[in-house]
Amino acid sequence: EESATILKANRATIIRRVTIPIVMPAILSTFLLIFSSGFSSYTVPVFLGSAVKCYTLSTKMRALIQAGYQGQGYIIAFVSILLGCLILGVNQHFTGKRKSFTTVTGKSGQVSLVKLHKANWPISILLIVFTAFFAIMPLISFALESVIRQPGNYSPSNMTLHFWIGTEDSAYETGMIAGILLNTTMWSALLRQVLLALVVSAIVGTCGMLIGYACVRRRGSRLSRMVESLAFFPYLMPAMAFATIYLAVATSANFKFLYGTFGVLVLVASIKFLPFASRSGVNSMMQIAPEIEEAAVIFGVPWRTRMTRILFPIQKSSIISGYLLPVISVMREVALFTLLVPYARYLLTTMLFSFNETGYAQYGSAVTLLIILIIILINFVTNKLTGASFDKGIGG
């Protein structure tokens, strides 16, 4: 773009002839990935669509399996997997045709600012309102919904803290003996969820870093492309279809020891969230020139020492971010675990789903707000201790 600017090309020509051809594969890839994410979504359709009888493949799949029609549910899962393969193929087709006009290496120090003039304040206000509506208002809504006895009535006389700190003596007939902060079932589910997140993070983060290292060091080879595609493929599979596969495996004669165990949750979550860590590993390793490691190889430095004393310190924030993302993903995941948990209140997220299914909206709102606060706390503590943060990007 700067070369075109020096040659007096106007902004419209630069965008049409330079910028768009370069970023078009990325735009198409983003569209395909967002389409895949929306297509495989389960939580949003089941919460918002059930009331108006709007069903998707994911919600239909779970309903069929729970009703005893496993065969039909597995067929829907198979169709979802085929669509995921198709999306992956189209994505690889477009991203494999990247164009590049790079003539020299290095980064420019030129900064181009756009003067908004009178539009400065309107645009700023619009962005503030937009951010507040989608980021702050939901938190306020969950907080209010968790302290009212009758939904929709926000008068002070209708508010209570029972759903948070209510004791057994003051409990309503709601299926719980106390508020969520004083209930042992909730704390057990929270501890399992945190333990699951930490175990999955350790497995996925380490595997993602190693996959990124191997793919970057063998960049361009057929094996590298194959490994990178296979590591990314679970992202394109609907979480409900993914859980259905492992449900079928765990209920088979040879693998019944997995059914309803903590181990099967670790296994399915590790594979499902591997794409995020592998992508983070690839991005972080691509930013390190191979000459740095080659210098250590010449001096006979072992591979383990090169990883721990050279590569990891250079990309510490990016690598730790690769460990952080699986933690956050596990802490908010519902669809992946709803078919595999031994009972509805085994994990905090499945407990939330159980509350909403049985009509206990206040408990559901309280648990949702608690999950959000825990995720924010994890991100804040990680940022303070290591400098890595989810809001600063993954693998950047």
Residue ranges and their predicted role:
Residues A12-T13, P45-K53, S108-L113, I148, ...:
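Membrane-interfacial helix termini and adjacent extracytoplasmic/periplasmic loops
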Residues P25-A26, F35, T184-A197, L236-P238, ...:
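Loop-to-helix entry region at the N-terminal start of transmembrane alpha-helices
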Residues E1, T5, A9-I14, V44, ...:
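C-terminal transmembrane helix and the adjacent membrane-cytosol boundary/short C-terminal tail
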Residues I76, S80-R192, L258-F262, N379, ...:
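N-terminal, non-cleaved signal-anchor transmembrane helix
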Residues I14-T19, Q92-G96, S141, A197-A231, ...:
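Transmembrane-helix boundary motif in ABC transporter permease subunits
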